[in-house]
């Protein structure tokens, strides 16, 4: 049977289980989360990151995709003015 090697990942994910003996003293036992717990944790973190990314993208999309002609006209004029101020820099 293979013995688990200490890697930065397993060292970081070690957690301490504290158990009380009959005489009231506490003992510490180092334990590692099993693979299922690690995968659950990883999937939870990645899901949260993905939700945040989707929310940011959706907000950006909403800010850019305003269908009114007035908005598009104003935006085009701003870009044109900005372009004229910069001139040909190539």
Swiss-Prot record:
Record-linked Pfam families: PB1-F2
Additional detail: Is not encoded in all strains, and seems to be dispensable for replication.
Keywords: Apoptosis, Host cytoplasm, Host membrane, Host mitochondrion, Host mitochondrion inner membrane, Host nucleus, Host-virus interaction, Inhibition of host innate immune response by virus, Inhibition of host MAVS by virus, Inhibition of host RLR pathway by virus, Membrane, Modulation of host cell apoptosis by virus, Viral immunoevasion
Originating gene: PB1
Similarity comment: Belongs to the influenza viruses PB1-F2 family.
Locations listed in the record: Host mitochondrion inner membrane; Host nucleus; Host cytoplasm, Host cytosol
Name this polypeptide is given: Protein PB1-F2
Feature type site, description Low pathogenicity: 66
InterPro entries attached to this UniProt entry: Flu_proapoptotic_PB1-F2
Coiled coil start-end: none
Main location group: host cell
UniProt-annotated stretches for the region Disordered: 1-31
């Amino acid at each position: 049977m293979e013995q688990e090697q200490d890697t930065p990942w397993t060292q970081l994910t070690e957690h301490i289980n504290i158990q009380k003996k009959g005489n009231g003293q506490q003992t510490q036992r180092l334990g590692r989360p099993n693979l299922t717990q690690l995968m659950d944790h990883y999937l939870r973190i990645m899901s949260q990151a993905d939700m945040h990314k989707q929310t940011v993208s959706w907000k950006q999309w909403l800010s850019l995709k305003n269908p009114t002609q007035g908005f598009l006209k104003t935006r085009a004029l701003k870009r044109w003015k900005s372009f004229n101020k910069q001139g040909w820099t190539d």
